[in-house]
Amino acid sequence: MAARYPFRDDLEIATILSRVSPRYLAPVIVLGGCLLIAGAGTGAVAGASGNPLAGARLYVDPDSNAARQVAEWQATRPEDAQQMAKIASTSQADWFTGGHGPAFRQQVAALTRRIVRARALPVYVLYNIPRRDCGFYSGGGATNGVAYRRWINSFATAIGNGKVVVVLEPDALAGLDCLSNRGRNIRYALIHYAVDRLARNPRAVLYLDAGNSDWKRVSVMAQRLLRAGVVRARGFALNVSNYQTTKASIAYGNRLARLLGRTHFIVDTSRNGLGPWSGGEYWCNPPDRALGPRPTTHTSSRFADAYLWIKIPGESDGTCKGGPPAGQWWPEYALGLAQRASW
């Protein structure tokens, strides 16, 4: 069965899907001829020298929605369960979109401990900027700047000084055109604050979100990243929750990296296997899309640290095209992504 999934990278993803029959996972835990041992729950990344993600291990959540879906389907829909296992066995980022006070700190700290105990590298997304998503499908965020700073402080306290990857505020810079001049200045200040606060941890690997290759001109995005404090971060993230091809993302990222003094970037490849849709609202639950390349540091650019699954495949983009509210699990959409994957 391994021949059906000829992965090019050497990212090793093992899984602790204890509730799932191993025969449904076998096709996806054999990577490049290297058999992984069920129970490890992590995956190893190998990459270029100087890359902070090289040699890291990525966490696979044994209780993810995809894992639960595999368990639910394995008796009655075995072929679909096998397809869903592609998602269940692949590392994905963990998102924090709100919360406050001791409960939030405990949530972050508990997850961080669990991942570290698995000898893995936490990959987190912070998505709580005030006026998030300009009030559209993923609208919300902190009530004001004071609340946001407190939230960032709580997160920073919870992760401590351990090594962690943080993707900071998807769409916040690319999408700030909906704000007034004062609102834009406030947003720049808040993201800059987040960068400064998180950078106190010298082991934090920070990437500011830079939209996608089909959104803003490179020169515009470079200016926005600089105002937001990218010089204190590792670099920027591209294509988060979007569908632009890896090739287009790398080309855009290379140009942007050079403008910023040869900084580095990561690309979200979770759902870009067939590129963007050509219809309206192409970014919101487009039909007939596919999973993209699995996480790896074997990229096609010396500036690109990794391809990662930052968006969780199968979570809705919003109430468009028949989808549930943003962030809710949509199993049939997830299944379609897996079925159309090239691997």
Model segments located where?
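N-terminal secretory signal peptides that target proteins for export/translocation
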Residues: 1-22
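Bacterial N-terminal signal peptides
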Residues: 27-39
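C-terminal region of N-terminal signal peptides and the immediate post-cleavage residues
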Residues: 37-51
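N-terminal carbohydrate-binding/catalytic regions of secreted carbohydrate-active enzymes
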Residues: 53-154, 158, 312, 316, ...
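Surface-exposed substrate-engagement region within the catalytic domains
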Residues: 55, 60-88, 213-335
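Second-shell loop/turn segments in exported
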Residues: 95-101, 136-145, 177-185, 209-212, ...
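Structural preference for beta-strand elements that scaffold enzyme active sites
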Residues: 121-123, 163-167, 203-207, 233-237, ...
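Active-site cleft segment of glycoside hydrolase catalytic domains centered on the general acid/base Glu
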Residues: 138-163, 170-204, 218-220
